[in-house]
């Protein structure tokens, strides 16, 4: 059998990337609303550009929210605190245009209304979950390292270790795989916004020493590993001044970095009645527990819904040929162990809480924070038992 030898690349972006600023603002607003009224319906979109943030969407809530204050606090925490950056939390304009959720949608989602008694899905659509045993977090290594690089960039910026850095940055990691196992980091790309007076040599040396070498395992690098640091040579203009940022523009960064499939729905700014978010989290929960159980080494789960209907129209489990038991039995176990109806997902994962701002940068998956209930592997034992392993 021919050996599989290929290079796979994933990217991530920092909390200061304009699209991620928008995601974090949308989720900060969602958290503020859920804190006061957990049953709220929220679809909050954000656009950020030079000197301005625009908030729009459909929100039905009893909460009383100071939208400009939340927007400004989020921008301040990210680090846009100087008008020289073209975006400053104290001076940026905040425009809002908020409507209520359509009653036609609401009756299909609200329990006891619409054509079905149970709480239905907030929309039609297909969502995917993924897990693999490449890393202890059961995430693909390329996206995990890409997230850790930009997270480290933010840490050294805020701590003053590399005080010339500014908030906007991106990373990209290319990994050589042999027979689907990561063996070598081929290329690391980092682009980070910086203050105008610093030399390129200082930027490159600082990022390689304080970021790359602190994150990329030494055993995966050698003399052939390529480091491309700020490859244009200059990155002073960045953030919302450099590019307009929009909620939901980084769906592959938010999920699995190109590994597995994606249904197209974004996460941020959406309350958990929206299955784009809650069912994607549930898909990760199912896939991660299957891999953690030892039933398979790699797993992709697809779930699909019709608007207003509680039961999924389909659930698919694909172990990419790594299953230790027949695929049909794995699918049966998933149906026996996991309830994929929207209300059940919300209850199992405890999603009516203000936990979403943390998800909005550095990945929704693979970060084992206490709030990230979909990262638990508490179903692995019962899966093993049912599989007879």
UniProtKB/Swiss-Prot annotation:
Query: Where along this sequence does the record place binding of K(+)?
Result: 45
List positions binding L-methionine: 58, 101, 243, 274
GO terms, molecular function: ATP binding; magnesium ion binding; methionine adenosyltransferase activity
Q: Which Pfam families match?
A: S-AdoMet_synt_C, S-AdoMet_synt_M, S-AdoMet_synt_N
| Oligomer status and interactors | Homotetramer; dimer of dimers.
Q: What class of enzyme is it?
A: transferase
CDD domains, per database record: S-AdoMet_synt
- In this chain, ATP is annotated as bound at 17, 168-170, 234-235, 243, 249-250, 266, 270
The EC number(s) this enzyme carries: 2.5.1.6
Protein name in UniProt:
S-adenosylmethionine synthase
Please state where this protein is localized: Cytoplasm
**PANTHER family attached to this UniProt entry:** S-ADENOSYLMETHIONINE SYNTHETASE
Q: Where does Mg(2+) bind?
A: 19
Q: Which keywords label this protein?
A: ATP-binding, Cytoplasm, Magnesium, Metal-binding, Nucleotide-binding, One-carbon metabolism, Potassium, Transferase
Q: Which reaction does it catalyse?
A: L-methionine + ATP + H2O = S-adenosyl-L-methionine + phosphate + diphosphate
What's this protein's function? Catalyzes the formation of S-adenosylmethionine (AdoMet) from methionine and ATP. The overall synthetic reaction is composed of two sequential steps, AdoMet formation and the subsequent tripolyphosphate hydrolysis which occurs prior to release of AdoMet from the enzyme.
GO cellular component term of the entry, any: cytoplasm
Secretion signal span: none
Q: How is the cofactor bound?
A: Binds 2 divalent ions per subunit.
Q: Which SUPFAM superfamilies match?
A: S-adenosylmethionine synthetase
Top-level taxon: Bacteria
Which cofactors does the annotated protein need, by name? Mg(2+); K(+)
Q: Which family does it belong to?
A: Belongs to the AdoMet synthase family.
